[in-house]
Every structure is written in structure tokens, then in C-alpha cells.
């Protein structure tokens, strides 16, 4: 039986490897003629990729490119990732050449994360097609294509939207999109906007786009992307792709789960802001006061921010009392628990959790929908503001805390100023009391789960992608 080899290259960073691994596992399960090599480009910041994200699966292997500290010299906030990927092209070329020379497989193509699309140059050298694996939402992809087309055909400069109250008509959204929820990189005049839209052009030039979404969540955006009159390659919505295995088994996780077991059903507000999420001391105190005022039970994942001069992951607090209001832990001990790192999927899956205050990262959004837990939107960076807009305005699946919040105010908005006690408290109260949001999320839960099983739209889309890989020529 001949084997077709796919080379996956995820972007560096904690959130990119797991969905890549899950997609690879899904493809291998569906077609035993496939094999996958995942090339991991390691960053020098923070811990290495968790080994839990690397299962022992037949026909799946990982090749690490060691951390190269010389890449620290490439730092520029909005263009670093592009330079980082370019820097790794020679190593990727050597790895792929080794695969071809040592294995009796047919190299079928590259599957590239958005920021890794320049690696399509390497794929072209080997005469194989490139596919994009878009791990954010379909609506965001549509916005990228829209702004890229306007730049290339109309000379449109998206950076002029900085500080603007303009609303944009974007085909992948039903409602006008406020400029204030655009990702900061779109507004960056120092190379970030150009890099972002150049990546959109690269994606448009690919042979196909795998999107971690589904009709149940983003029907409108997916219909636009698949309308066949916009110069966009075939789109394969295969989501939600999630790691549903809660393998973490340690004393801290056990303690968290025991505490949740003692809480009434749907009574707990879970606050968690992703692998890079943290706040300054003033904002932490505002959150604490809001939680206490709301009176709701809570589980709060609280991380220490890193110094501004360093680029690394947030750390654990050694003493929570140093950052929380005096007496907070004692006063709330009967209804709440403050933790460091959180086993997010295990928490969201627990029946006692009734709401999720989230940064709206796409992985977290999909996990929340899968578990049927309503969200309160508090985005921090990247495309999370767009995700918040999608959830709050487009779909009605989330309450708003502050949709246009940014941790970095370089783009010129005041969205990075502290969110007030009142905003947070109002968001939590709406999150836990709005029956309409809860019912909508329950409906999406059922439909998104149906999408990935046999007979579902995403299940069918995976099959179409495998067929495409088998037949496509560059």
C-alpha cells in the first residue's frame, strides 16, 4: 500500500501545536495511506511545547528544530514571526529532503499554519502543493481576504483606520465591523499590516484552506468563502478540532476537580485568559472586586505578568495575597477558588461550570461551544477582538465585558485602559442570567458535535480534503 506523506508546519507558540496534532490524528484515522511529519520550530521564550501534545500515533512523527537564540535579534513586535519563519527555511528544506531520501513515500504536500505560509516557497522547490490550516475563525479569514483585495486592487490602506470610528462592510460578517475591533497588526504602519495582508495573499495562492470551524458556528462566513466567485481556493471546514483527552493527572488538577465536584450545577464562573493572559495589579483588583460583588461562585486562573522588557509566558504567583485586595481570599473562601494554570477543557466539561470569562482565543471559543458553556468576552490581543465581535454581535453566543479591549495600546485606542469593576460585574451577571445566550450555546453545542461524526458536514469535509490531496497537482 503506497503512502502519501504530508508535512505539517505549525506556527511557534503554545496555541498552535495542539490543533495541528489533532488535525493530523484525524487525517491518519480516516485514511491509512497517509503519513504525517510535523516540523516544530521552537521558540526561545517560555517552556518548550508540552509533550502531552505529542501522542504516539502510527504514521505520525515529530521533528524538532532546536531553539536558535540568534532569532532574538529578529524581535519587532508585529513582524517578528515573519522573520522567524524566513530564518527557518533552510532547516525545513533539509528536513524534507531527508524525508524524501530515506522513506519510500510520495511527498503529497505541505500543510502550513497562517504565519508559516512563506514555507510554500520550499514546497514549490519540491514540486508539491501547499495548503493552509487556518486555526482561527472563517470570518477572520474572510476579513483578511477582503482587506488584501482592497489593498491590491483599490490601493486601500487599512492603517488609516487607526483611531477611527469607521465601520467596515466585510462580506464574511453580517453586521458592519467597527475599526476598533480590528487586530492591531492590521493597523500597524511599521510593517505589521503589510506582513498580515501579504500572508492573506499567500493563503489565497494555496491549493486549499482547512478551517477549524463548522457550519453550526460560522455558516455565513463559510458560505462567502465557498461562493466560487472571489478567487479563493477550495475551503474545507473541518471543525471543531479539539483535544478532548484530559491527560493531566497531578495534585493541583485533582484539587481543582474535587472543588468543582462540591459546587452546584452551572453555578461557577470560570475566569481564564489563555497561555499569554495576565493583568497588572490594578486590573487584578478590579476583577476581584467585581467577582465579589457579583456574589457568584468562581474559579479564577490568575497568572503573574512578565516584565515589559521580556517576551515570555506569564508565571505563577508565589503569594496570591500580594496582588489581591486585602482579605479577598478569606471573604470568598466558601464560594471561590483562585488558581494558577488551569486544565481548561476539564474545567469547561464539568457540570458545575455555568459561564466562562474568556480572552476569546479561537481554541478556547471552540472548547466553550463544544461544552455548551456561555462566554463573557474580554479579548486581549491578536484576532481576539474579532472573535469577541463575532460571539457578541454576530452570533449572540456571549455577553460583553469589553469587546475592544487591548493589552497593548500601540494602535492608538484607549481600549487597553483598565476595565472597570462595573463593566466586569455587569458582564458576569449577564453571563450567568441570560437564558437566551445559554439556549443558543446549547444549540451550537449539539450541532457542532453532530458536524464531526459520520454524516456531519465537517466529517464530509475531511473526506473531501483527503480526496483533494490524492488528486491535486501543483
Curated annotation (Swiss-Prot):
What the record says about family reads:
Belongs to the UDP-glycosyltransferase family.
For the protein in the UniProt heading, the enzyme class is transferase
Name its species. Answer: Stevia rebaudiana (Stevia)
Described function: May glycosylate diterpenes or flavonols in leaves.
Name it.
UDP-glycosyltransferase 71E1
Give the InterPro entries listed for this entry: UDP-glycosyltransf_plant, UDP_glucos_trans, UDP_glycos_trans_CS
* Residues spanning the signal sequence: none
Q: What is its EC number?
A: 2.4.1.-
Q: Tell me the PANTHER family matching this sequence.
A: GLYCOSYLTRANSFERASE
List UniProt keywords, sorted A-Z.
Glycosyltransferase, Transferase
Pfam families per UniProt? UDPGT (PF00201)
Please give the Gene Ontology molecular function terms for this protein: UDP-glucosyltransferase activity
Is Glycosyltransferase among this UniProt entry's keywords?
Answer: yes
Binding locations of UDP-alpha-D-glucose: 275, 341-342, 359-367, 381-384
Question: What domain of life does the native source organism fall in?
Answer: Eukaryota
Q: Which SUPFAM superfamilies match?
A: UDP-Glycosyltransferase/glycogen phosphorylase (SSF53756)
Amino acid at each position: 500500500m503506497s503512502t502519501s506523506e504530508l508535512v505539517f508546519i505549525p506556527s511557534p507558540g503554545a496555541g498552535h501545536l495542539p490543533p495541528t496534532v489533532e488535525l493530523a490524528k484525524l487525517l491518519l484515522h480516516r485514511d491509512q495511506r497517509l503519513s504525517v511529519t510535523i516540523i516544530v520550530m521552537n521558540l526561545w521564550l517560555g517552556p518548550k511545547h508540552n509533550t502531552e501534545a505529542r501522542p504516539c500515533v502510527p504514521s505520525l512523527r515529530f521533528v524538532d528544530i532546536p531553539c536558535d537564540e540568534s532569532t532574538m535579534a529578529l524581535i519587532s513586535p508585529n513582524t517578528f514571526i515573519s522573520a522567524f519563519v524566513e530564518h527557518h527555511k533552510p532547516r525545513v528544506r533539509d528536513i524534507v529532503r531527508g524525508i524524501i531520501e530515506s522513506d519510500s513515500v510520495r511527498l503529497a504536500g505541505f500543510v502550513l499554519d497562517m504565519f508559516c505560509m512563506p514555507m510554500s516557497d520550499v514546497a514549490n522547490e519540491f514540486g508539491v502543493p501547499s495548503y493552509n490550516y487556518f486555526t482561527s475563525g472563517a470570518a477572520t479569514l474572510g476579513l483578511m481576504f477582503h482587506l488584501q483585495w482592497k489593498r491590491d486592487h483599490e490601493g486601500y490602506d487599512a492603517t488609516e483606520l487607526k483611531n477611527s470610528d469607521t465601520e467596515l462592510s466585510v462580506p464574511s460578517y453580517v453586521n458592519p465591523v467597527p475599526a476598533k475591533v480590528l487586530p492591531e497588526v492590521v493597523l500597524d504602519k511599521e510593517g505589521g499590516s503589510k506582513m498580515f495582508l501579504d500572508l492573506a495573499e499567500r493563503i489565497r495562492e494555496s491549493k486549499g484552506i482547512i478551517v477549524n470551524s463548522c457550519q453550526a458556528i460560522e455558516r455565513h462566513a463559510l458560505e462567502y468563502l465557498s461562493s466560487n466567485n472571489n478567487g479563493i481556493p477550495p475551503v474545507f471546514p473541518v471543525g471543531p478540532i479539539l483535544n478532548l483527552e484530559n491527560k493531566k493527572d497531578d495534585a493541583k488538577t485533582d484539587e481543582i476537580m474535587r472543588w468543582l465536584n462540591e459546587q452546584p450545577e452551572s453555578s461557577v464562573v470560570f475566569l481564564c485568559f489563555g497561555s499569554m493572559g495576565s493583568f497588572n495589579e490594578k486590573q487584578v483588583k478590579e476583577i476581584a472586586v467585581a467577582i465579589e460583588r457579583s456574589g457568584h461562585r468562581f474559579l479564577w486562573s490568575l497568572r503573574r505578568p512578565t516584565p515589559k522588557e521580556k517576551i515570555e509566558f506569564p508565571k505563577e504567583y508565589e503569594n496570591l495575597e500580594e496582588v489581591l485586595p486585602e482579605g479577598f481570599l478569606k471573604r470568598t473562601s466558601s464560594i471561590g477558588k483562585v488558581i494558577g494554570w488551569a486544565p481548561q477543557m476539564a474545567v469547561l466539561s464539568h457540570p458545575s461550570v455555568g459561564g466562562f470569562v474568556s480572552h476569546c482565543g479561537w481554541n478556547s471559543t471552540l472548547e466553550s461551544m463544544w461544552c455548551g458553556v456561555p462566554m463573557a468576552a474580554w479579548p486581549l490581543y491578536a484576532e481576539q477582538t474579532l472573535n469577541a465581535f463575532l460571539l457578541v454581535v454576530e452570533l449572540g453566543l456571549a455577553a460583553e465585558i469589553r469587546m475592544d479591549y487591548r493589552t497593548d495600546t500601540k494602535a492608538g485606542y484607549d481600549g487597553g485602559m483598565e476595565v472597570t469593576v462595573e463593566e466586569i460585574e455587569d458582564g458576569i451577571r449577564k453571563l450567568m442570567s441570560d437564558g437566551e445566550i445559554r439556549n443558543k450555546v446549547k444549540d451550537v453545542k449539539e450541532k457542532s458535535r453532530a458536524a464531526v461524526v459520520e454524516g456531519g458536514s465537517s466529517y464530509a469535509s475531511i473526506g473531501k480534503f483527503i480526496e483533494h490531496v490524492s488528486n491535486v497537482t501543483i
